[in-house]
């Protein structure tokens, strides 16, 4: 059976959790990167017999997450997968208010999680899988940038 690898950020709740639950299908392997692991998702993966790894990592540190992803991908055997997809879904929405009332720290956090981390993760993903012979995809989802 061909295994499809999905790497999904922001999978511990909301739309990311809903996507992760839908990806718990036979033939898929799922790596989730979120601030918190989700015990219900782990249980659902176990029941579905779908390989699931949950990394707890705050994507405000996109560089650290991208280095870990690159190293992990380089340690994988490409022959184990029929396709590989990175879904950048994590995001932080700062308090909604006029820009003049916004705090610089809130705006910076939103940019780190919603822009810097997806760019760094995408670069790591594309670089580490460059020689992989199967289809590779990157999907970026944004809630507020």
Task: Put a short name on every predicted segment.
Residues 47-63:
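Rossmann-fold cofactor-recognition segment
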Residues 9, 81-91, 114, 140:
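Rossmann-fold scaffold of SDR-type NAD(P)-dependent oxidoreductases
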Residues 26-42:
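Conserved glycine-rich Rossmann-like NAD(P)H-binding loop of the short-chain dehydrogenase/reductase
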Residues 74-78, 113-134:
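Amphipathic alpha-helical dimer-interface segment in Rossmann-like NAD(P)H-dependent oxidoreductases
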Residues 82-85, 93-108:
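Conserved mid-core segment of classical short-chain dehydrogenase/reductases
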Residues 91-92, 104, 130-145:
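Catalytic loop of short-chain dehydrogenase/reductase
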Residues 103-119, 139:
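Catalytic Tyr-X3-Lys loop
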Residues 12-13:
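Conserved glycine-rich cofactor-binding loop
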